[in-house]
Amino acid sequence: ASELEKIKLKSQLKLLQEGETGEKNILFELKNSGIDMYILHDIRLEDGDRSAQIDFLVVTRKLIFVIESKHLIGDIEIDENNGFIRSYEYYGKKVREGFYSPVTQNQRHLQLIHDVVMNHKKNAIMRLAFDHWFSDYYQSLVVLANPKNCIRNYSKDKQISQQVIRADQLISTIKKM
């Protein structure tokens, strides 16, 4: 392999390792929370041509949390239109780039969970009840696992502020809900 290919491969490997580190940090927080819960980690859900890789599905006595973990480098900004931007330095140069909304990504995960369950419930009353109460009992959280991240949230959407949190806020957020 060429030097450029080796550098790209090392970079991709480092990103994977950082992602794993972030998920381990979140798992540690969950396991040491003192809250009764079931923790399902790294779930792949498929329904026809749709699929989702869910980082954590956490079942507590009150709610079910679908958690998307992100271990990103740099400072994270959420603009007034709910766009996600990260800023970091790369070889002395400041880089500012947008990235796909993890909130939107996690909403897709929730929608797939909803659809899979609805497709497997045969009783009309159970389907109606599940559909009606789904958004009350299934909650989306995006957890930024890198402790060095600074979050600047300019979103006018209150839900965004409640859904995008740092790893050190995870347990207090779960307890409040």
Per-region residue spans from a language model:
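Surface-exposed interaction regions that form or flank ligand-binding interfaces
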Residues: 1-52, 89-177
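Cell-envelope/extracellular polymer assembly enzymes that use nucleotide-activated donors
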Residues: 55
